Amino acid sequence: MLRKTIWLGQPSTTLSHLPVVQKQFLSAFLILCLSFLISCGGGSTDSSGGGGTGTGGGGGGPIGSPTVQHVGIVVFENQNYADVIGNSAMPYLNGLVQQNALATQFYANVHPSIGNYFMMTTGQVVTTDDNFSGTISGDNVTTALTAAGKTWKSYAESLPQAAYVGGDQYPYIKHHNPFAYFDSVQNDSVQRDNIVPFTQLHSDLSANSLPDYFFVIPNDLHNGHDCPAGGSNCPLSDRLGTIDSWLQSNLGPMLLDSHFAGNGILIITFDESANDNTMGGGRIAAVFVGGPVKNNFQSTNTYQFPSLLRFTLKTLGVTAYPGAAAQAPDMKEFLK
């Protein structure tokens, strides 16, 4: 570059013929230009940071990258955030919190349960009647997944049989299984076959045939709704301890399995708080676990179930979001 003829007022004057002062000026000018070019060629800055803390990575691949192949949700029942996070009765779950990511300001949308299950899967409350026995038409998480060529399953503990869309068979409770209400599932035998007993999850994991999206439904003895032996007369620590041990025994092995650990995300949450009405359904825990999730990360941004629905779809590369999920705040900050 310095061999090129440079014009400074006289024709055919090259660098070697310039006076010392001009050489110094030109050298400084060239260094300044080079510095400018280097600074312009640097990496871009992502300005979409969220209100989070921790040691998570700074950006990684975009949501929907091939590194995320499975997204699952397990939903427990009726517990306040403050009763779950940091509670010594739940050492396994709180250990996962320390290693993964936590939404510290996550709120259910409504009371009672059923409206939150529908919000997680349709982006609408639909009803607040836990005894609702109708069917639901329109877009939902399964129609969005199917249209995008993705697979799904609902793994329900104590489900009487595969493809069952009937009423309660205690300790299986229908209104904890929103998929059983969708007409797009009820009227299609292929879709209906995606509602399976929970035991099928272990078989699918062993066969490396986990679906892209899955929803785990513990029964009422294990989800914190009832006491472990039935009924409602037991200390809270008994219910929380049962949730924790069930989670560790039944989903802990999956989190360590090579078919899931590196490319899967499990979201552990609750349908509603026990006695808090903040933002409709109260503050609840939402824990994000898996290889693609930031480590030791805590978000202080406010979210509700429409954002969770959006996250589960968008992370798998789906671009159509039902109901309120279409405009819900993005949760991409939880990914590496």
Each model region followed by its residue ranges:
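Sec-dependent signal peptide recognition
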Residues: K23-I31
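C-terminal motif of bacterial Sec signal peptides marking the signal peptidase cleavage site
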Residues: F36-S39
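N-terminal pro-sequences and low-complexity stem/linker regions of secreted or lumenal proteins
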Residues: G42-K336
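Serine/threonine-rich, low-complexity intrinsically disordered segments
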Residues: W7-L8, L15-S16, C33, S47, ...
